[in-house]
From Swiss-Prot:
Major localisation: cytoplasm
Cellular localization per UniProt: Cytoplasm
Tissue: Detected in retina and placenta.
Protein's name in the database: Age-related maculopathy susceptibility protein 2
Disease implication from the record: Macular degeneration, age-related, 8: A form of age-related macular degeneration, a multifactorial eye disease and the most common cause of irreversible vision loss in the developed world. In most patients, the disease is manifest as ophthalmoscopically visible yellowish accumulations of protein and lipid that lie beneath the retinal pigment epithelium and within an elastin-containing structure known as Bruch membrane.
Amino acid sequence: MLRLYPGPMVTEAEGKGGPEMASLSSSVVPVSFISTLRESVLDPGVGGEGASDKQRSKLSLSHSMIPAAKIHTELCLPAFFSPAGTQRRFQQPQHHLTLSIIHTAAR
């Protein structure tokens, strides 16, 4: 519910949603944070049910470096974008995100 939202959201905004959506995403989530997330989004195995332990460990490691303040900010993002119908597009990353958080919390 927290990890992969900004990456695909900003990517979609730049290509389809127009500059308003892109600037809103960029202003809420730090750019360095987004680039970290994009790597995970581009790897279809990370966080998924078929992911190896090595992939999960890598995901947890990068997640553990994220300050709690940024995580909280990220949780607010879906509320901004759901009226535009973008939430439907990001259900898959959201699912991976939840797995990542559960795995990180278990450590």
